[in-house]
Regions:
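N-terminal "domain-start" segment that seeds a small globular fold
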Residues: 34-68
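Short, internal strand/loop/helix patches
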Residues: 123-161, 290
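Loop/turn elements at helix/coil->beta-strand transitions in domains of secreted/extracellular proteins
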Residues: 72-75, 104-107, 134-136, 163
Length: 365
């Protein structure tokens, strides 16, 4: 991963959001309500942004696009990475805008800049595009060249480029969908599209794409590898690449986590060496998600989840049944818990019935 990247960017945004939710303060948008719009006569970032696409490693869903191919178009550029839950929750809007404005001069371009090493695998990205019904052009930015050309520093991030090639709008994080769509309409109108459809799209987001329950959110993203993890509570502390037998303490404080069984805690993930290893996490949120995958491509790892020592029942996520059973088949984000009100502090446990799983990060919603 490039040293220019702030690996904590999403986590800082989520932490700010949790603080606002806990204080009962409302704020437009979700994660990281950072946005700006430049009028046509302002000192908007001059041309060059579209030339940044020349740094892409590959293109999916489209031949390579650049300034020549996009001349005269309004371009929505979104930086994303396929395991990012914050990006997943923006996806219904990206699909809707693509469909609504495709005949009015809008071109949506996704820039896939990976956070985890396995996200550089093109087969993984192709599978994600198919599973998530992403049909618009995607630039593969594994070398971070496009990211740096835009001076970007967050997932997800939206940039709107006008028909003259100038960056006129930027929004970092989730939310602000009304403002973003209004900016799209304005730039399309400026470009001479007199019949731009008015109003705002209405989306019905389901599963992992549903908006976070901000009022109940008290848990933020946490990585599991020794380099970036927080609140690791197993006796003996972090493993730093060593194979160890871990145990879960009798009690976990909120947002603390622990391992049980034979694990190796590498810098960026934890890897299970023997069957029946567990991860326990004390959380306060509607949703529990875990980025994980088999250590060997093509293998399947069975797991079972419990909440407060009980089967999840109706609180199961989309990747788990009511008895808590699921299977890790690919390297992606798995939604394990989606519970209803009331939301309280609860203890989550996932037991892997087979060895050979790698777990990277928890996210909540």
């Amino acid at each position: 991963m490039s040293e220019a990247i702030d690996h904590n960017r999403r986590r800082v945004m989520v932490a700010s959001l949790i603080t606002l939710a806990a204080a009962g303060i409302s704020k437009p948008g979700a994660v990281g309500a950072e946005s700006s719009f430049s009028p046509a006569d302002a000192q908007a970032q001059e041309k060059g942004a579209l030339y940044g696409f020349g740094g892409a490693n590959a293109w999916l869903n489209s031949p390579p696009l650049g300034a020549a191919e996009l001349r005269g178009k309004v371009v929505l550029v979104q930086f994303w990475t396929y395991t990012c839950v914050n990006w997943l929750r923006t996806l219904p809007y990206l699909r809707a805008w693509t469909e609504k404005y495709k005949d009015h001069g809008l071109v949506v371009v996704g820039v896939h800049t990976p956070e985890f090493e396995f996200e550089k695998n093109l087969d993984n990205v192709r599978a994600a595009l198919k599973d998530m019904r992403v049909t618009y052009p995607v630039a593969i930015d594994s070398s971070y060249m496009v990211w740096r050309a835009f001076s970007n520093n967050a997932w997800p991030a939206v940039y709107l480029i006008d028909a003259r090639g100038r960056v006129r709008y930027r929004h970092l994080g989730e939310g602000e969908y009304e403002h973003t769509e209004q900016a799209i309409q304005q730039l399309l109108t400026e470009a001479g599209n007199a019949d731009v459809a008015g109003g705002l799209v209405s989306v019905e987001a389901r599963g992992v794409e549903a908006a976070a329950d901000l009022a109940s959110l008290r848990s933020g993203e946490n990585y599991l590898g020794s380099e970036r993890t927080e609140n690791f509570a197993s006796p003996g502390g972090k493993g730093y690449g060593q194979r160890r037998a871990y145990r879960v303490p009798d009690r976990l404080a909120l947002n603390h986590w622990a391992l049980r069984g034979d694990w190796t805690q590498a810098g960026g993930f934890v890897a299970l060496n023997k069957p029946n290893g567990r991860i326990a996490y004390r959380f306060h949120a509607r949703d529990v998600n875990l980025v994980m995958g088999p250590a060997v491509r093509g293998n399947a790892v069975r797991f079972r989840v419990l909440v407060d020592g009980k089967l999840p029942g109706a609180a199961h996520g989309v990747d788990v049944d009511e008895q808590g059973n699921g299977t890790v088949t690919g390297q992606r984000l798995y939604q394990l818990i989606r519970q209803s009100q009331p939301i309280t502090d609860r203890q989550f446990e996932i037991e892997f019935l087979d060895s050979g799983v790698e777990a990277f990060a928890f996210t909540f919603g």
